[in-house]
A protein has these predicted regions:
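Conserved ATP/PPi-binding loop(s) of AMP-dependent carboxylate-activating enzymes
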Residues: 212, 223-252, 274, 284-286
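Gly/Ser/Thr-rich phosphate-binding loop
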Residues: 158-162, 166-212, 217-221
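Conserved AMP-binding/adenylate-forming
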Residues: 1-34, 111, 115-118, 285
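Conserved AMP-binding A3 loop
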Residues: 71-98
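AMP-binding/adenylate-forming catalytic domain of the ANL superfamily
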Residues: 345-366
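Conserved AMP-binding/adenylation subdomain of ANL enzymes
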Residues: 95-112, 120-159, 213
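AMP-binding/adenylate-forming catalytic core of the ANL superfamily
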Residues: 235, 260-348, 367
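Conserved pre-ATP/AMP-binding loop-to-beta segment of ANL
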Residues: 60-75, 82, 105-112
């Protein structure tokens, strides 16, 4: 069966997940923050056969069984439309957990994870699943809380997974390792922070600080070293399929990520952003991420997202949405344009800057660029 887990994060969630696996079933975590109509749409789309809530365990009519070996169905973050159900097997979950633990030199007798990200999304759920697979202790919090995150480190927790906004709100220096996913990482990160790259289809982060984990292969477009193109990933931690039965992988098992990037001469991956988010201005392609990274170095800027608006002359123009630091005044547009022009390219400099209170984000911390307008 596919069992929807409509429970808050915490020990009861972990107990229920373990019981589902022990019964040979697969779990579909439901985000408890969703309004009820959104939950019902999610259930109608992904069609679990049973649902577990605080009130009990119920059959759900019209559900579709899983394939043998399936472990999870996880909704994508939905930055580009209605979330899909990504099917992961016990083999792919194990491969991801083992590769992560090896890459971080995790010792179950020494280390302890803290799970504080939403468990309905792969970044939070993978902390719990790798704990179950490897036997590493894990403290599961119902939600991110600054005081609790800091106090858990003082109590001996050594590993935590955060998104950029959460990292900026707490002191995580007490952890041996902080995995950072979601939105673009700050240019200057603490020494215990590892910047991760991955997605629901890859079973969470599969590239750490630009280097693929064991068992992960990377390719760019046609394979030309140093060229900019779509990032392709291959490895045993990839999804089996989507819930509707479609398989996004190409011939040879390569998964097209939809992200643009390149592989440096030293083998490390640089990701520039979603292929669909490239701004084409005056015939030149502008990737948002490099522009955001440069603007983030300005003292006045707390957060920034770069995208586009239609332009009658240039086709599209580069626009920066900026969240200011408390008490800061907005930098002059001319200053921003000069900085970006000198660090990235003159044509990449924003034509417009919009000051906002906050950036729209997915539960996983990624900016929803389509909601910037």
């Amino acid at each position: 069966e596919l069992v929807a887990l409509d429970l808050p994060a915490g020990p009861a969630f972990v107990v229920a997940l373990r019981a589902i696996w022990d019964a040979g079933d697969a779990a579909l975590p439901i985000d408890p923050r969703l309004p009820r109509p959104a939950v019902e749409r999610r259930l109608d789309t992904l069609r679990p056969t049973r649902i577990v809530t605080r009130q009990g365990n119920y059959l759900r009519p019209g559900g579709i069984p899983i394939e043998p070996g399936d472990a999870l169905v996880v909704a994508t973050s939905g930055t580009s439309g209605e979330p899909k159900g990504v099917v992961h097997t016990h083999a792919s979950v194990t491969a991801s957990a083992v590769a992560t633990s090896a890459g971080l030199d995790v010792d179950p007798d020494r280390d302890r994870w803290v799970a504080c990200l939403p468990l309905a999304h792969i970044g939070g759920l993978s902390v719990v699943t790798r704990s179950l697979v490897t036997g590493t202790p894990c403290t599961v919090l119902e939600r991110f809380d600054v005081d609790t995150i800091e106090s858990e480190a003082r109590r001996g927790a050594s590993l935590v997974s955060l998104v950029t906004t959460a990292l900026g709100r707490c002191d995580a220096s007490g952890y041996r390792v902080v995995l950072l996913g979601g939105a673009a990482a700050p240019t200057a990160s603490p020494p215990n922070v590892i910047k991760t790259y991955g997605m629901t289809e890859t079973g969470s982060g599969c590239v750490y600080d630009g280097r693929p984990l064991d068992g992960v292969e990377l390719r760019i477009g046609d394979g030309t070293l140093g060229a900019v193109g779509e990032v392709l990933v291959r490895g045993s931690m990839l999804l089996r399929s989507y819930r509707d039965g479609t398989d996004p992988r190409l011939a040879g098992g390569w998964l097209p990520t939809g992200d643009g990037g390149r592989i440096r001469d030293d083998g490390t991956l640089v990701v520039y952003g979603r292929m669909a988010e490239v701004v084409v201005t005056g015939g030149e392609k502008v990737w948002p991420v490099p522009v955001e990274a440069v603007m983030a170095t300005l003292d006045q800027v707390a957060e920034v997202a770069v995208w586009k608006r239609p332009d009658p002359e240039w086709g599209e123009r580069v626009v920066a949405w900026v969240v200011l630091r408390p008490g800061a005044e907005a930098p002059a547009l001319e200053e921003v344009r000069a900085l970006v022009g000198s660090e990235v390219a003159p044509y990449a400099a924003p034509h417009e800057m919009v000051i906002v209170e906050a950036l729209p984000r997915t539960p996983g911390g990624k900016v929803r660029r389509t909601d910037l307008f």
